[in-house]
Amino acid sequence: MIKLIGCVLIISACTQMGCAMATDKIRQMKYLKLFRRLIFETRAMVEGGMTFGEIILKLSLQKDYSDFTFLSQDTSSPDVRRRITEEIHKSKLFDNEIRQTAIDFFEKLGTTDINGQLAYISMSLAALDEQISRLSENFTSQVRLCRALGVLSGAFIAILLI
């Protein structure tokens, strides 16, 4: 009886681990799409002639981007750009490739004329679109695979213990 209870606990723990991995994949896609929308909205702000500080302030006040803690920096400080990039680097919201795209975006934002910024925004959007399409190719199968691997690993461990 104790072995059976132990096996059920192991299977349920491994199932939860698989669900956590699947949730992580879903969260990664959510934040990637949200960051793409942030860059797209930034394009309109740059076209409107807003400065770097105004853009960061406006983005930080929007509820959609409340998970992006790197936006909540004091824009009156001269080293706001450096602090934002440091916060992005520490952030766990993105994987390494997307994190580097975000760092590059905020390092370049507001450093050139409007046409240069718009060109760089277009390049950043193209890079994010490529990353989104790459992640979307097998997204549902990867989520299902994570869940299935959790259940199967739990069953395998339970069988080994019996």
Model-derived segments and spans:
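Juxtamembrane/interface alpha-helical elements of multi-pass membrane proteins
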Residues: 3-73
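Residue-level recognition of alpha-helical structural elements
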Residues: 28-31, 53, 80, 98, ...
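Short amphipathic alpha-helical coupling elements at transmembrane boundaries
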Residues: 37-44, 104, 123-130
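Membrane-interface, cytosolic juxtamembrane amphipathic helix immediately N-terminal to a transmembrane helix
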Residues: 110-151
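Short, non-transmembrane cytosolic segments of multipass membrane proteins
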Residues: 84-115
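Bilayer-spanning, highly hydrophobic alpha-helical transmembrane segments
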Residues: 5-17, 136-162
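A short structural micro-motif
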Residues: 62-66, 78-79, 127
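Membrane-anchoring/interfacial helices and their immediately flanking loops
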Residues: 70-96, 158-161
